[in-house]
């Protein structure tokens, strides 16, 4: 049974907790990267909204696939996609892990980009599944807000993983979505800025 209205606070708190862990305790997150990527996939699936004019059975299928704190008729919005995009961007940010003891004992700044690169494919695959869900939509404004975070994931994706994703993990519509995202990524990547 779903709540009467969507509780966006739950989404924001999940993202805030993950952001804090990524920013402050990278040493703990590195050992649980499959779990982190799975949670990010679940957050992407939570951004979906049912297509208009679905039948009762189809609507129930969509409602059952969403968390109980999301009312399908009042889906998550642009602010939540911005929040998730910030989390995705944070994954490539270099952070320090403070070792308890003297203040001189600091590790060098590192990001999760390298260890997470093995798991980026499944996050992008989840995004393409959300895009191509026949019973749901991902509105254009939400897709637009997710782009900076998705571009960070594309930056982490090595060529071998990208090719493997294209060949074996995606269907025809997923491949088209991947090509579209990659085209946009390439366009913004080589603008000469930064």
Model-predicted segments: where are they?
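Amphipathic alpha-helical segments within extended alpha-helical solenoids and repeat-rich scaffolds
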Residues: 1-7, 18-21, 32-70, 108-135, ...
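Amphipathic alpha-helical elements of HEAT/ARM-like alpha-solenoid repeat scaffolds that form extended
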Residues: 10-22, 55-56, 80-105, 142-154
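Long, acidic/serine-threonine-rich intrinsically disordered regions with weak helical/coil propensity
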Residues: 12, 69-73
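C-terminal/domain-terminus segments
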Residues: 147, 166-169
């Amino acid at each position: 049974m779903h709540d009467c209205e969507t509780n966006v606070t739950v989404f924001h708190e999940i993202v805030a907790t993950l952001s804090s862990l990524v920013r402050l305790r990278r040493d703990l997150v590195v050992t649980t990267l499959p779990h982190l990527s799975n949670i990010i996939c679940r957050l992407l699936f939570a951004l979906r909204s049912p297509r208009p004019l679905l039948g009762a059975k189809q609507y129930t299928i969509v409602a059952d696939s969403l968390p109980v704190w999301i009312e399908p008729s009042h889906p998550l919005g642009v602010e939540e996609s911005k929040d998730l995009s910030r989390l995705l961007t944070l994954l490539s940010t270099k952070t320090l892990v403070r070792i308890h003891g003297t203040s001189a004992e600091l590790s060098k700044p590192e990001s999760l980009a390298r260890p997470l690169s093995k798991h980026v494919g499944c996050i992008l695959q989840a995004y393409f599944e959300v895009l191509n869900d026949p019973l749901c939509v991902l509105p254009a404004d939400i897709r637009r807000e997710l782009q900076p975070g998705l571009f960070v994931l594309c930056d982490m994706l090595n060529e071998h993983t990208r090719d493997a994703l294209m060949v074996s993990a995606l269907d025809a519509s997923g491949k088209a979505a991947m090509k579209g995202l990659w085209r946009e990524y390439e366009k913004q990547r080589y603008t000469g800025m930064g």
